[in-house]
Structure formats: C-alpha cells, structure tokens
Amino acid sequence: MRPEAQTGHLPVSQSPAVHLPVLYTQVLEGLRVIENGRYLDGTFGRGGHARGVLTQLGPEGRLLVMDKDPEAIAVAERDFAPDPRVSIFRGSFAQLLQWDATAEGLDGVLFDLGVSSPQLDVAERGFSFGKDGPLDMRMDPDSGESAAQWINRVEEREIADVLWTYGEERQSRRIARAIVARREKQPFSRTAELAELIASVMPRGKDKIHPATRSFQAIRIHINRELADLEAGLDAAVERLKPGGRLAVISFHSLEDRIVKQYMNRLAKAPPANRRLPEAVAFVPTLDLIGGAIKATDEELAANPRARSAVLRVAQKREADA
C-alpha cells in the first residue's frame, strides 16, 4: 500500500513538475527500499531521489535528508517538512555521525556527489564558467572562503598543485602563472574573468570540452573539501548502516569514483597475500559489492546529457555472522 493511502497526505513525490534525477531507477533498485526502513539522503539537492524513496516508504518508515547548501535545505523544509516521516539537517554528509537521528541505524544511505544542476545553472552561485557571476563556488556560502578569496591569496605553486591534483590539468603550471600575473594588476572577482584568462593561455587542441572545465572542477573540489568529506562520509555511512543496509554512491568524475571503488573493494575483498610480511589477522569483509559500475541508459542520456559521466556503485553491509 502506498503512503498516501496510509498516512492521509499526498507525498511530495506526486508533484507532476518534478524532473527525475540522474540514475533515478537504478538508485531505488540499488537501495532496495523496505517500507518501514530508515534511509539517509546525504545530498538532498532538490529532492529528486528523496521523493523516490518516499514513494516506497510506509507510514512507519523514515527519511533523513542532509545538504550543505542552504537553498537545498530551504526546498526540503518547504516541500518535505510537512511529511512526518522526514527529518532535515543542514550540513555535510561527513558530519552524519553528529546527527542524533542517525544513531538508531540506517537501512540505506545515498550520496549523489559533486555540484547540482541548480548550483550550475544559477550564475550567482559562481560554479559555472559558461555564465558570468561572482567567483564563489561554495556549496555552503556561509562557510569558508570563496574561490575568489582563495585564488587571490595563495601562492602560484599551491594553485598549480590544486589544478593538477583535483583537475588533472596538464597545463596547471602555465595557468597558475597566468593567474598570479593577472591578479597583480587586478584581483579576480567574476567567473568570466577566470574562464577567459584560462582560455587565453591554453594551447589550441582537439579537446571538445571548454578550456576552463578542469580548472573550475579542481578549484570547486578544493574550496569545498569534497574528497576529504567523501572519505569521512563513507566511513560514517558504513558505521551507521545496519547489517543488510545498503550504500549507494553516484560519482561524476574519475577522482570521486576511484575513491568510492577502492573504499568498497577494501571492505569487501581480502588484500593480496604478501609472503614478505608476517601472517596477518584473517580478513573479515564488512561489505558485499552489489554489481559493478552502473551507468545511465541510452534513453536517459537522450533526455539528460548531464548523466553521461555518472557512475553508481552499491554495496551492502554484511550480517555479523556472514
């Protein structure tokens, strides 16, 4: 029986204007939602996946939603707070252990990594090189320094290291040198200024992506501590999962996916034996992998080109005696 028949209210998932998020069907299949379960959406965004979970929860089920972005939390409070099954927390999923509501354990956890479409589409958020706006890039605009503050402050070497480490940008040193030379004349304040500068110093090639793509990605990841938060969030999620609970993670670039894949493999598979080392304690797996890398179907890609780089990985926490 669906929630509306049991709780007397129409769930937010019934809104006809809702656009399905990336890998919607695959996420719900991966989480394997049970009616009375407790689930955490650690990256609420605009609530697309959360709506799907709610359609499969009964009146005793619970959905906990988190997001760093105050605009996302405002949407959650507007559209989801009236539902008694929903609890809302503003913060990074790396902080989920600090939320008392997670202490009872979770039957499923979802992380949909990276920047959301609303963040990219609104120029004032400062994430997009294609739309001029303040050079900000913070997912939580009330916390930390903006991209402009960082890029106008740090040394050339740090800029180059960030572009290489988080963007795998081969021209990182050339771009960093140009950034420092430009800011000595006039500090950066707009996304268009940075994007145009990067484009002006990049060698012409056959690459179809915008010249600033990797640099903007790298700066955004650094400003928001995305990879550090991911590592902490994975640990916290597994700690809170009940035996049999599932962890589903959507990543959008190789750096994220590599961390997720290696983390799940490390908890699911015994490391190779090394005869040079003393015999180790017997490996006890914590997770079981549920399939491999899951990608968007051709049908979804036709409707949503942004899904082309999305990769979903799912793992299940083992029973204590498994």
UniProtKB/Swiss-Prot annotation:
PANTHER family in the record: 12S RRNA N4-METHYLCYTIDINE METHYLTRANSFERASE (PTHR11265:SF0), S-ADENOSYL-METHYLTRANSFERASE MRAW (PTHR11265)
Gene this chain is encoded by: rsmH
Localization: Cytoplasm
Family, similarity comment: Belongs to the methyltransferase superfamily. RsmH family.
Gene Ontology molecular-function annotations: rRNA (cytosine-N4-)-methyltransferase activity
Record keywords, A-Z: Cytoplasm, Methyltransferase, rRNA processing, S-adenosyl-L-methionine, Transferase
Gene Ontology cellular component list: cytoplasm
Name of the protein in question: Ribosomal RNA small subunit methyltransferase H
Binding site for S-adenosyl-L-methionine: 47-49, 67, 93, 112, 119
Native source species: Stenotrophomonas maltophilia (strain K279a)
Top-rank lineage group of the source organism: Bacteria
Catalytically driven reaction(s): cytidine(1402) in 16S rRNA + S-adenosyl-L-methionine = N(4)-methylcytidine(1402) in 16S rRNA + S-adenosyl-L-homocysteine + H(+)
EC number(s) per entry: 2.1.1.199
Function in brief: Specifically methylates the N4 position of cytidine in position 1402 (C1402) of 16S rRNA.
Any Pfam family: Methyltransf_5
First-tier enzyme category under EC: transferase
Tagged with keyword Endoplasmic reticulum: no
Biological process, per Gene Ontology: rRNA base methylation
